[in-house]
């Protein structure tokens, strides 16, 4: 999936769909984080956006099931779909993670975006990926993130189920000093989601600093 700060692109699952349409375009609702759920629906409908990558503020995977069902019904009525979710909270508590996957299955979500605070959490997530057949994609948040360096991410995914891949944030990977296009190719088909944004990169106090910019105006 791709996001315009965040536009979002998701890679289709089948070879046939990849040939027909390499990516599907949508919007990451973090972009609309100052709006409530109903306003997000109105915005998407007004601008002809069908695909949403939803954040927990707009649909909480741990909310009461009746609330979740009601919000899904609103999306369905308005021709919208939550086809990805995240960045999702994860835990060493397997039951906590299971609820996230149960939510994703109910919503029809194909990819869950994650950024676990502990590498050991992947043991739980991998079991759920295999049980539910739902992909997860590891997000990067610059060099301050555990996953800011692509080498770390590659080391994780090469030893895990192929349904564990990457959410490549183009702005943040650029801010970390990497060539986004080169990194994309190096992941060799394991990029399942893209956050499309732009940043200019400056050196401040001997550190790389990424500053948000309009797409096409930055260094990404």
Where do the protein language model's features map onto the residues?
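Glycine-rich, proline-tolerant flexible connector loops at the mouths of alpha/beta enzymes
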Residues: 53-76
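Active-site acidic/histidine proton-transfer and metal-coordination neighborhood
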Residues: 5, 11, 39, 58, ...
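Short amphipathic alpha-helices and their capping/turn segments at secondary-structure boundaries
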Residues: 39-45, 67-74, 179-190
């Amino acid at each position: 999936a791709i996001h315009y700060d965040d536009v979002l692109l998701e890679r289709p699952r089948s070879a046939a769909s990849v040939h027909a349409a390499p990516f599907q375009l949508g919007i990451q609702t973090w972009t609309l984080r100052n709006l409530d759920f109903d306003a997000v629906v109105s915005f998407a409908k007004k601008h002809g956006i069908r695909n949403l990558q939803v954040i927990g503020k707009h649909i909480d995977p741990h909310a009461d099931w009746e609330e979740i069902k009601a919000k899904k019904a609103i999306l369905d009525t308005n021709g919208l779909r939550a086809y990805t979710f995240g960045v999702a909270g994860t835990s060493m508590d397997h039951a906590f993670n299971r609820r996230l996957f149960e939510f994703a299955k109910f919503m029809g979500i194909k990819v869950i975006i994650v950024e676990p605070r502990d590498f050991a959490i992947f043991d739980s997530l991998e079991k759920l990926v295999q049980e539910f057949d739902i992909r997860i994609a590891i997000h990067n948040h610059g060099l301050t993130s555990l996953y800011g360096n692509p080498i770390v991410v590659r080391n994780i995914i090469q030893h895990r189920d192929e349904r564990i891949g990457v959410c490549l944030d183009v702005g943040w990977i650029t801010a970390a000093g990497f060539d986004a296009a080169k990194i994309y190719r190096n992941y060799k088909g394991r990029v399942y989601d893209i956050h499309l944004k732009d940043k200019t990169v400056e050196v401040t106090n001997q550190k790389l600093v990424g500053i948000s910019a309009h797409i096409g105006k930055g260094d990404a």
